[in-house]
Amino acid sequence: MLVCIGFTASTTFMLFMNCNQELGKLYGMANPSMIQSFYSAGIICAVLLTAALMKKGLKPIRVLVIYPCVAFCALLLMYFVQIPQICMIGGFLIGYFAAGGVLQLATSTANEMFPRDKGKITAVVMIASSIANYAVLNVASLLSKVGGVEGPRYILLFNAVVTAIGIVFAIILNLRFEKDAQ
């Protein structure tokens, strides 16, 4: 499950990072590069606030469900609300809830679950992330070609589907974790 989350977590932020400017243009933004600034601000906030929440007792395994759920909602919001401002709001939300440490928390959770094989499990999760970098960008390229002007919106939907799959994996993982804890 954690390996699959490595794939889906990477997909969520990477697809957005690579396609947000085209989405901004489609939605009529005068300066679509602003999306990247909001995305980066989201990442910085996520790192700081998530660390504080962890110190207060939030479990990383819970973040693996909560953060992708918010990212999923942000992707759908950007799909349905086609105005320039939503790109900046969505950029911040994806930066925070997708790029702000979900992959790293998946890796640390894997290390916690497999303490004797930390190196191996880290490598496998990161290999899944690397495969996502290659595979989903190729799919996004195809969607962009097939979708024409609407290509960025098709990519949002594809991203939402992959993120939803990651949420299912995270829920299953949480249920197993709870069962093992009892």
Model-derived regions, located:
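Helix-to-loop junctions at the C-terminal end of transmembrane segments
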Residues: 46-59, 144
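Intracellular juxtamembrane helix-capping segments at the cytosolic ends
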Residues: 100-114
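Extracytoplasmic gate region of multi-pass secondary transporters
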Residues: 1-44, 107
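Residue-level signature of mid-helix packing/kink "hotspots" within the transmembrane helices
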Residues: 40-48, 130-134
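Hydrophobic core of transmembrane alpha-helices in multi-pass small-molecule transporters
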Residues: 7, 86-101
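Symmetry-related core transmembrane helices of the 12-TM Major Facilitator Superfamily/SLC fold
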Residues: 154-174
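A late C-terminal transmembrane helix in Major Facilitator Superfamily
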Residues: 111-148
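Structural signature of the two symmetry-related core transmembrane helices
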Residues: 62-77
